[in-house]
Design a protein with these regions (language model features):
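N-terminal targeting/export leaders
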Residues: 5, 13-155
Length: 155
């Protein structure tokens, strides 16, 4: 029985494919669901990479169940962000809503995809309430338990 329990989470992760990220909701958005599919960005060489050798991905989001942004506070739009795993760099990918959309390109080695309610759809700096988030496949082996945010210490 113990072996079966260990296999189930791995099977659940693989069901989405190696380049799909299941986005997790928050207590403030219990009905929100989403996936982010990472698709290699266009390149004449077949695979797009940065000068440092990091893969470049276009992010395609499929979202449902997001409430109106105003239900979370003084917000008017949802914006998708690509975020480094240390939470120091937030790169705006674009405005999103329920449905499917390709929002932008991310080229971090390990990263998070975050959908947040923001005061404006053109927001260039994250300041709003997080509605959905997920970790890139390259970040699955990293633990965030040691990050100050999760230990109750301000970064």
């Amino acid at each position: 029985m113990k072996g079966l329990i260990a296999i189930v989470p791995v099977t659940a992760l693989l069901a989405f494919g190696p380049y799909d990220i299941q986005l997790q909701n928050t207590p403030r958005t219990p009905n929100a669901r989403g996936t982010a599919r990472l698709v290699f960005a266009e390149s004449p060489f077949g695979v797009a990479v940065t000068a440092d050798g990091h893969a470049r991905y276009d992010v395609r989001l499929s979202l449902s169940g997001l409430p109106e942004p105003s239900a979370l506070g003084a917000y008017k739009a949802y914006v998708a962000w690509g975020v480094t795993t240390d939470l120091r760099q937030w790169r705006r990918l674009g405005p999103v809503g329920n449905g499917e959309s390709t929002v932008g390109t991310v080229d971090f080695n390990k990263f998070l995809i975050v959908v947040a309610a923001e005061s404006d759809s053109a927001a260039t700096k994250h300041a709003g309430a997080v509605a959905l988030s997920g970790t890139s496949p390259s970040g699955w082996l990293q633990t965030f338990l040691s990050h100050p945010l999760f230990r109750g210490i301000a970064p």
